[in-house]
Amino acid sequence: MSLRVRTAVFAASLVASVVAMMTPVHAQILPTPPGWQIERAVVLNRHGVRAPIATNEQLDRYSATAWPTWPVEPGFLSPRGEELMRLMGTYYRVLYGGRGLIQADDCPTAGTVAAWTDLDQRTRVTGAAILAGMYPRCANLPLRNQANFTVPDPIFHPQPTASCPMNGAANQAAVMARLGGSFASALRNYASQLTMMQSVLCPAGATKGVGGGSCGEAGVASSVVADADGWVRLRGPLGYASTAAENFLMQSAEGMPKDQVAWGRIAHDATLNELLSIHQFVQDLTQKTKPIAQQRGSNLLSLVGAILVNGHSFPGHAATGQPVRLGLLVGHQSNIHNIAALLDLTWQIPGYLPAEASPGGALAFEQFLDVSTGRRYVRLAYYAQTLDEMRRRAPLSYRDPPGMKQVALPACAADLVNDACPLESFLKIVKAAVEPGCVTSSAGNY
């Protein structure tokens, strides 16, 4: 081993040791093993805090009180959400700069840090905010998205093809099979949460929404509906409660006054989490049911594997020059849930529910090189600001980090080295998890 390599490894190990000593115990992130160095990270980031996707007119139809207004259009990242993602970007620089992956105190080498975002305003502005937080004085950082805005980006929103038909009726049937053929069990299991939600949406026994609909969709029969592209959603009390609960979470993260968060009818975060358990259940059904996860997540997961093998495989990246070392893929909670389902992943950040894809949260795939053997390994981690950090707009640092959790990869349990999965094993797991017919050329090859 050359003196330069030995020096680099020693420096990286020293930084990792310092980081481990400075990072609070609750962070639960493993240090870089001695003799290893981090080589690449692919970070699948959810967009930050946004306004409700539905209009107030649509939401008001099913609530007894008009919903509060946001300073942006429906579905847009709010200014507060943008600020919070800049704070997260600052922490990414501290985290990955401290590990020696990227520059910590200067602009990155051209091409080594890049972001690819979905087409929505909330994803594009999230990507820009993260990069601005990482390197506020650096210009021309690669922030790209698909040039054609008239069709969905197949990385984040794959569309039906001959080899991946995404049949709506089949997806409906798969969801109903997980429900045991009817909603009876689900409605029974979530009866207390639905009653709680009904008291928030429709206090004093209100039966009509201000927009004229059935308050809380209480009188609407539960059903699974699918669109022409195979997307499924739930109608009825569970579906509307899921939407409402996530909107309450966004209100709280936005720092709205307590009398505006769920109209002041939720006293504690524990109550909010009770309501969010409905949202988690609905997301599990609509995003984690196996055929749906394979249809929606195979392209993205294959792309992650391709980027780890070759940093030039990052979307929009030139075939010449430096490979990407830190690549941000900015999408949606559905993308994270799809990948979590394919790899059987779970995590829990303090204050959130297990496996919650929180606003601005990220699932990271981190690749390490064992310098002495030349072998490569992959670890997974989840990073997210806690709800309290978002409400306080808390600056993030080694001493005051966001929530973070090492994420186990069950399929690699027998092959782990230093709690990391050998790259070749990880790639085999990815290939076994995806549906080949749902992987397009845009996902790269390895």
Where are these regions (language model features)?
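Sec/Tat signal peptide C-region and signal peptidase I cleavage site
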Residues: 22-27
